[in-house]
Amino acid sequence: VRDGVIKDETFLPLIFSAPPDADWKDEAVWARANPNLGVSVNLEFLRSECARAVEMPAYESAFRQLYLNQWVEVETRWLRMDHWAQGNGACPVDLAGRECWAGLDLATTFDTTALVLLFPLDDGTFWVEPHFWIPSDNAHQRERRDKVPYLTWHRQGHLHMTDGNVTDFDQLRRDINNICTKYRVRGIGLDPWNAAQLGQQLQGDGLPMQHFRQGYASMSAPSKQLENWVVSGKLLHGGHPVLGWQAANVAIQSDSAAGNIKPSKAKSTERIDGIVSLVMAIGLWQTATAPTPEQTWDLTVI
């Protein structure tokens, strides 16, 4: 009606929205998009929703779309580094023989391969042990391209290197088996796309491999859980530099209507494979520890 596509003189379209460049945290801006603010639109509710968007950047797009009628990109920078830094301390317990879940994200041509293990601790926090691999022959090239110190990280023990200029999957397989012998690994999530052979080999080695596709259905709930743990300080990672770099890189994409989110490799500025692996590990933990519905019995009278 507004654009003249449909002619209906009984219909008056009025669209109230905040200007695209307006400060979405300014209450005066809220009034421009909500002319009935304080009457049918509750001001305290909007304040609480705005505070949520400030604390959790992934919610900013939804707040601006739903309450300010702004057109925004569906992806947004995700994790705040001051929140992430709450997990920088050393691991408080001995992890040997401890129960954990893991996610494995295999590298494409330029990515890192990442295995991330998630350990639930007795105090309700979660320790993360990440492992990363790149090929040794192009490490200098990767440093120049990504502008991060891969060689230094390797010398410090934060990054594995495989021989050659592509990932050596035989070495990767040996490394993963050696890592997993130290713990009680309950599941390793792996997207079956382009990884079927290694997944079958690792399963043949006795590792508990599980298919974990990287769509909204699988990734949204654990992504939200990760965000919650980061904000609340429950995610402990020891300040691992590679994982921290990738946490700073990650952006999410969202189907705003349903409220689903997931990390987006396409929208992120640099590598995020460790975060994707961590989300998969959280997803397996959620599935394994979800309460089983109590069985109920119905009485049938004949």
Regions found by a protein language model. Name each.
Residues R2-N34, R145-G157, Q201, D205-T292:
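Metal-dependent DNA phosphodiester-chemistry modules and their immediately adjacent helices/loops
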Residues F110-D123, I272-V276, M280-A281:
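Acidic, metal-ligating active-site segments
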Residues N178-R186, D205-M209:
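Short, surface-exposed connector motifs at secondary-structure boundaries
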Residues K182-W193, L198-G199:
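Short glycine-rich phosphate-binding loop at a beta-alpha junction
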Residues P291-I302:
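Acidic, low-complexity intrinsically disordered tails
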